[in-house]
A protein has these predicted regions:
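Noncatalytic, solvent-exposed loop/strand surfaces
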Residues: 1-301
Length: 301
């Protein structure tokens, strides 16, 4: 994550660093947050006020931590509270803790005048006080794991796919307290829900594409599916939008532009070498696209 004069990098357990963007000097590093990422780290850091917030959902340890962004010192650390209920007959976690890991990046929202850090882990979505790490509420979905998407917020609700296995898209009222599983889920859908690509909230509608190439438009307030159409290809990268169009990036290298409307319409398609696994970065009017073989900057001239 980048701000004026600084860039913050994390590789998960291998380390976290802060660099000066002008001098390239390393201002501080941390390598003492340890967990078994199992298949590698996937959660990005975020900034909130003077804090750099990190997520560690490993097979062995699961926690969220906040560092002072100026010094790298720990401000708070909070362990995940869900009971995974995944022990085998020998008292060991199933598949070495495979169901305990996660890859989601959190989001800070303002709801009812209160800041909440919305963080999706294995089997649960949590809300924390971003300044102290105190858990505010939790929604548990025990049959899902390896959540990879970032939540979105609007219309007084948090929207997020729950992860792999029996993944669903949930709409949650973030005004709860404690275990809110039975009280604060407003709607859910199981049809063509993405596991890896994050969802977009554009006005009154949620747009998403599942890993197998089915794109959907869903009414945010009700959960009613407006349309669901096969775009084709396989997907790991998250879509982006300019407010009028939604752009999907396939593992085969195809970019598909779809109208961000209630009626499904493909507006354009293009092809790049390699294929997309990483989500695009947007800088001013340009896209920074990383395929398996190339790094591209694309903008309108």
């Amino acid at each position: 994550v980048v701000e004026a004069g600084r860039v913050y990098l994390t590789w998960g357990s291998p380390g976290t660093a802060c660099l000066d963007t002008k001098s390239n000097d390393v201002l501080w590093t941390r390598d003492d947050f340890v967990c078994d990422h199992f298949r590698g780290a996937g959660s990005s850091p975020i900034l909130y006020k003077n804090l750099l917030i990190l997520t560690f959902d490993g097979a062995d340890h699961q926690f969220v931590a906040a560092l002072d962004k100026h010094t790298g010192k720990t401000v708070w650390r909070t362990n995940r509270s869900v009971d995974f209920q995944d022990l085998d007959t020998n008292g060991k976690p199933f598949r070495g803790g495979d169901l305990r890991k996660g890859y989601s990046t959190p989001l800070v929202i303002q709801h009812g005048g209160v800041a909440q850090l919305i963080s999706i882990g294995a089997m649960a979505c949590y809300a924390y006080d971003p300044l102290t790490g105190r858990e505010l509420w939790r929604v548990t979905e025990r049959d899902q794991h390896s959540a990879s998407t970032r939540p979105v917020y609007g219309h007084g609700m948090v929207f997020y796919p729950t992860g792999f296995s029996k993944g669903q898209l949930l709409a949650v009222d973030p005004g709860g307290s404690g275990d809110s599983t039975e009280t604060n889920i407003k709607w859910r859908t199981k049809r063509s829900v993405s596991n890896k690509p994050s969802v977009l909230l554009i006005g009154e509608h949620i747009f998403m594409i599942d890993d197998g190439g089915i794109a959907s438009c869903i009414e945010a307030k009700s959960g009613e599916i407006t349309w669901s159409e096969r775009v084709g290809g396989n997907y790991s990268a998250s879509p982006v939008t300019d407010g009028k169009r939604v752009f999907f990036f396939s593992e085969e290298g195809k970019t598909t532009a779809v109208a961000a409307r209630r009626k499904f319409e493909i507006l354009a398609e293009s092809q790049l070498d390699g294929g997309f696994m990483a989500s695009p970065a947007v800088h001013d009017a340009a896209w920074i696209l990383r395929t398996k073989t190339h790094l591209y900057r694309i903008e309108k001239q």
